[in-house]
């Protein structure tokens, strides 16, 4: 039987991918809540949905199976006992472990069918929707200026981050910011209780940690090499932790930890660096020094479960050695222009989704970067992006590969 998850590269022909179609959670962003919910702008939902449907169709037209996060979650929660356990944890992680608000939310959500319940949780639950019959101190002292008892999850359409497929398993990630932490709880239940995955996948690292790692920083370069960003959203300690697990229980023996600026514009490694062919990568010039260097550390398994570590700055040489290539082609976002590069990187010009070696999906708005990719022999499928890009994530961010062919 084929493995439920199988991803041994960034570029192997994509067979199955998990998406989330943006829903009403997008319309529950307000100017006052944008910072709290990690948004810089408010997408126009009807157009964002059309753009997302175009993205999904672009993938299915290439023979790729598209499965949806929200549907997988509903199927995982068909059992009443599992659904009740899930709701207890979800409500607790929303700030209500016990009390009348917890009980009112449980009554409100448990009455729904699993699909409606998941959709409502992602959309957010307004205080006005829930009937609190006998108030307690927590309920009467709740911030009346904030309309939600359970915050919306507008970042859910970036399915890359709450988990990362690696080999025949995945990491279920401890997210950095509160706005996204509950997303990976849904992943946990999908993997534990959806028949497609239950009992069939290895979990290299679960979400029950103090240190953070997110899927946008986890790049699977081949069947034994990973690149992981040390970033705003992923800590060095988390990288060492997952390295120990992978070195012990998998074929992975090399992790390249790449240090990038810790800011919102470059929140993950895949916003500035992605693999698009056997020896070709996109790179945002701003992460490199004038002579093309970037701090990176190569981790290998040592004795007795320890990790050996070597510091380097020449990323080309590190990649050539790790991937056994004579040359590495780093293709600069925006052709390296000091104005075009940061503009197109802001709109995810570096965030390419490889669907086969030398074949990528990109946002249409990044035309300078797209033309340069074509000049380097890459086949580019452009997708519409006027509203989706307002969330600060591109095609790689919006997709979680589940199965790829080996390269």
UniProtKB/Swiss-Prot annotation:
PANTHER family: ARGININE DEIMINASE (PTHR47271:SF2). HAMAP family: Arg_deiminase. Its EC number is 3.5.3.6. One of its GO terms (molecular function) is arginine deiminase activity. GO terms for cellular component: cytoplasm. The active site is at residue 397. This is Arginine deiminase. Keywords: Arginine metabolism, Cytoplasm, Hydrolase. GO terms for biological process: arginine catabolic process to ornithine; arginine deiminase pathway. The gene is arcA. Signal peptide: none annotated. It is found in: Cytoplasm. Belongs to the arginine deiminase family. It catalyses: L-arginine + H2O = L-citrulline + NH4(+).
């Amino acid at each position: 039987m084929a493995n439920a998850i199988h991803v041994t590269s960034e570029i192997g022909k994509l067979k199955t991918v998990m998406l989330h179609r943006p829903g009403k959670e997008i319309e529950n962003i307000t100017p006052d809540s944008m910072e709290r919910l990690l948004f810089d702008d408010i997408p126009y939902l009807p157009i964002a949905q059309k753009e997302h449907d175009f993205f999904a169709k672009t993938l299915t037209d290439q023979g790729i199976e598209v499965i949806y996060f929200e549907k997988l979650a509903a199927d995982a929660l068909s059992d009443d006992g599992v659904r009740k356990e899930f709701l207890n944890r979800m409500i607790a992680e929303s700030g209500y472990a016990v009390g009348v608000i917890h009980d009112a939310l449980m009554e409100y959500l448990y009455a729904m069918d699993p699909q409606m319940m998941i959709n409502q949780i992602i959309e957010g639950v307004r205080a006005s929707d829930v009937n609190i019959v006998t108030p307690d101190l927590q309920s009467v002292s709740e911030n009346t200026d904030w309309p939600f008892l359970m915050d919306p999850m507008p970042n859910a359409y970036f399915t890359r981050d709450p988990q990362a497929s690696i080999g025949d398993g995945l990491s279920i990630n401890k997210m950095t910011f509160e706005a996204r932490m509950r997303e990976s709880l849904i992943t946990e239940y999908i993997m534990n209780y959806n028949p497609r995955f239950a009992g069939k996948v290895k979990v290299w690292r679960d979400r029950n940690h103090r240190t953070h790692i997110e899927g946008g920083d986890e790049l699977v370069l081949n069947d034994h090499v990973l690149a992981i960003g040390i970033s705003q959203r992923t800590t060095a300690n988390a990288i060492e932790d997952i390295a120990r697990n992978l070195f012990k229980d998998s074929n992975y023996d090399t992790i390249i930890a790449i240090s990038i600026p810790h800011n919102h514009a470059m929140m993950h490694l895949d916003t500035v660096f992605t693999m698009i062919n056997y020896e070709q990568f996109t790179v945002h010039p701003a992460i490199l020094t004038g002579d093309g260097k970037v701090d990176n550390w190569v981790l290998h398994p040592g004795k007795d479960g320890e990790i050996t570590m070597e510091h380097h700055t020449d990323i080309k040489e590190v990649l050539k050695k790790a991937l056994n290539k004579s040359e590495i082609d780093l293709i600069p976002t925006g052709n390296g222009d000091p104005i075009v590069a940061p503009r197109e990187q802001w709109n995810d010009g570096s965030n390419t989704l490889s669907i086969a070696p030398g074949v990528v999906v990109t946002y249409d708005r990044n035309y300078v970067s797209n033309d340069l990719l074509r000049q380097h022999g890459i086949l580019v499928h452009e997708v519409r992006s006027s509203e989706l890009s307002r969330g600060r994530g591109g095609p790689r961010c919006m997709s979680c590969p589940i199965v790829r062919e080996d390269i």
